[in-house]
């Protein structure tokens, strides 16, 4: 009976290493990385914007918890849990404005759509995926721009003046041409009838020509300037209102 062999040290060591390897591999089996856009996403005030997010390696995320929040106070922008959108957990300023696009959630890809973009939406967003106790996240940035950011007063005046100048030159040339033809025609008729012709008869005062050309020009220009100022005041008022009442 003394000849019964005990487990050798190498075999015990191999079993221990195999068990350790299985535990490590099982612990890493559920891990993944969350990937978001590397560059800032740009949107215009009042438009829609989409914030994409995915996990790598790709896997079915239907049973995971997926969401977006805004640092630093972790305001919930959108939350997906237990296969449903949890609208009750949203921050008040995002209720009714977000939609989670889940067409590719089986591949671990989702997109958050935000409607009616506001100035207050500018800044950082964080997307996260949670699988049981394991969670990973990725940060992204949204840039909100004024739809009329390129319209400076100088550009507006230039856009208004160029067509006006062309219109003024065209109207002036047409007016002079008609006046010349009319004077020539009347002169010929008067000479044929042997009547006295007064060269000042068809001469139009300069102030009348100026009034005839300038008045139609100033009207559209003034209207454009008023429209520009109204739009900027409206956008500025919306921005200040969002700052006063963020929720």
Swiss-Prot record:
<keyword id="KW-1133">Transmembrane helix</keyword>
<keyword id="KW-0472">Membrane</keyword>
<comment type="similarity">
    <text>Belongs to the immunoglobulin superfamily. BTN/MOG family.</text>
</comment>
<dbReference type="GO" id="GO:0007417">
    <property type="term" value="P:central nervous system development"/>
</dbReference>
<keyword id="KW-1015">Disulfide bond</keyword>
<feature type="disulfide bond">
    <location>
        <begin position="53"/>
        <end position="127"/>
    </location>
</feature>
<dbReference type="GO" id="GO:0001618">
    <property type="term" value="F:virus receptor activity"/>
</dbReference>
<comment type="function">
    <text>Mediates homophilic cell-cell adhesion. Minor component of the myelin sheath. May be involved in completion and/or maintenance of the myelin sheath and in cell-cell communication.</text>
</comment>
<feature type="domain" description="Ig-like V-type">
    <location>
        <begin position="32"/>
        <end position="145"/>
    </location>
</feature>
<keyword id="KW-1003">Cell membrane</keyword>
<keyword id="KW-0393">Immunoglobulin domain</keyword>
<dbReference type="InterPro" id="IPR007110">
    <property type="entry name" value="Ig-like_dom"/>
</dbReference>
<dbReference type="InterPro" id="IPR013783">
    <property type="entry name" value="Ig-like_fold"/>
</dbReference>
<feature type="signal peptide">
    <location>
        <begin position="1"/>
        <end position="29"/>
    </location>
</feature>
<protein>
    <recommendedName>
        <fullName>Myelin-oligodendrocyte glycoprotein</fullName>
    </recommendedName>
</protein>
<dbReference type="GO" id="GO:0001817">
    <property type="term" value="P:regulation of cytokine production"/>
</dbReference>
<feature type="transmembrane region" description="Helical">
    <location>
        <begin position="155"/>
        <end position="175"/>
    </location>
</feature>
<keyword id="KW-1183">Host cell receptor for virus entry</keyword>
<dbReference type="InterPro" id="IPR036179">
    <property type="entry name" value="Ig-like_dom_sf"/>
</dbReference>
<keyword id="KW-0675">Receptor</keyword>
<dbReference type="InterPro" id="IPR013106">
    <property type="entry name" value="Ig_V-set"/>
</dbReference>
<keyword id="KW-0225">Disease variant</keyword>
<keyword id="KW-0732">Signal</keyword>
<feature type="glycosylation site" description="N-linked (GlcNAc...) asparagine">
    <location>
        <position position="60"/>
    </location>
</feature>
<keyword id="KW-0130">Cell adhesion</keyword>
<dbReference type="Pfam" id="PF07686">
    <property type="entry name" value="V-set"/>
</dbReference>
<keyword id="KW-0325">Glycoprotein</keyword>
<comment type="function">
    <text>(Microbial infection) Acts as a receptor for rubella virus.</text>
</comment>
<dbReference type="GO" id="GO:0050852">
    <property type="term" value="P:T cell receptor signaling pathway"/>
</dbReference>
<dbReference type="GO" id="GO:0007155">
    <property type="term" value="P:cell adhesion"/>
</dbReference>
<dbReference type="GO" id="GO:0005886">
    <property type="term" value="C:plasma membrane"/>
</dbReference>
<dbReference type="GO" id="GO:0009897">
    <property type="term" value="C:external side of plasma membrane"/>
</dbReference>
<feature type="topological domain" description="Extracellular">
    <location>
        <begin position="232"/>
        <end position="247"/>
    </location>
</feature>
<comment type="subunit">
    <text>(Microbial infection) Interacts with rubella virus E2 glycoprotein.</text>
</comment>
<feature type="topological domain" description="Cytoplasmic">
    <location>
        <begin position="176"/>
        <end position="210"/>
    </location>
</feature>
<feature type="topological domain" description="Extracellular">
    <location>
        <begin position="30"/>
        <end position="154"/>
    </location>
</feature>
<dbReference type="GO" id="GO:0005102">
    <property type="term" value="F:signaling receptor binding"/>
</dbReference>
<keyword id="KW-0812">Transmembrane</keyword>
<comment type="subunit">
    <text>Homodimer. May form heterodimers between the different isoforms.</text>
</comment>
<feature type="transmembrane region" description="Helical">
    <location>
        <begin position="211"/>
        <end position="231"/>
    </location>
</feature>
<keyword id="KW-0945">Host-virus interaction</keyword>
<dbReference type="InterPro" id="IPR003599">
    <property type="entry name" value="Ig_sub"/>
</dbReference>
């Amino acid at each position: 009976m003394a000849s019964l062999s005990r487990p050798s040290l190498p075999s015990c060591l191999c079993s221990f290493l195999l068990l350790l390897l299985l535990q490590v591999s099982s612990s890493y089996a559920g891990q993944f990385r969350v990937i978001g856009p590397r560059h800032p996403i740009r949107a215009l005030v009042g438009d829609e914007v989409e914030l994409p997010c995915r996990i790598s390696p790709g896997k079915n995320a239907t049973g995971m918890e997926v969401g977006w929040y805004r640092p630093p106070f972790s305001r919930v922008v959108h939350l997906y849990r237990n296969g449903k959108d949890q609208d009750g957990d949203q921050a008040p300023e995002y209720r009714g404005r977000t939609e989670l696009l889940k067409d590719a959630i089986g591949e671990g890809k989702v997109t958050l759509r935000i409607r009616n973009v506001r100035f207050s939406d500018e800044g950082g967003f964080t997307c996260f995926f949670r699988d049981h106790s394991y969670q990973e996240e990725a940060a992204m940035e949204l840039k909100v721009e004024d739809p009329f950011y390129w319209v400076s007063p100088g550009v507006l005046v230039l856009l208004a003046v160029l067509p006006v100048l062309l219109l003024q030159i065209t109207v002036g040339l047409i007016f002079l041409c008609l006046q010349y033809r009319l004077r020539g025609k009347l002169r010929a008729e008067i000479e044929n009838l042997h009547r006295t012709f007064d060269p000042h008869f068809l001469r139009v005062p300069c102030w009348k020509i100026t009034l005839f050309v300038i008045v139609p020009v100033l009207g559209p220009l003034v209207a454009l300037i008023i429209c520009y100022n109204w739009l900027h005041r409206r956008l500025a008022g919306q921005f200040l209102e969002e700052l006063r009442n963020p929720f």
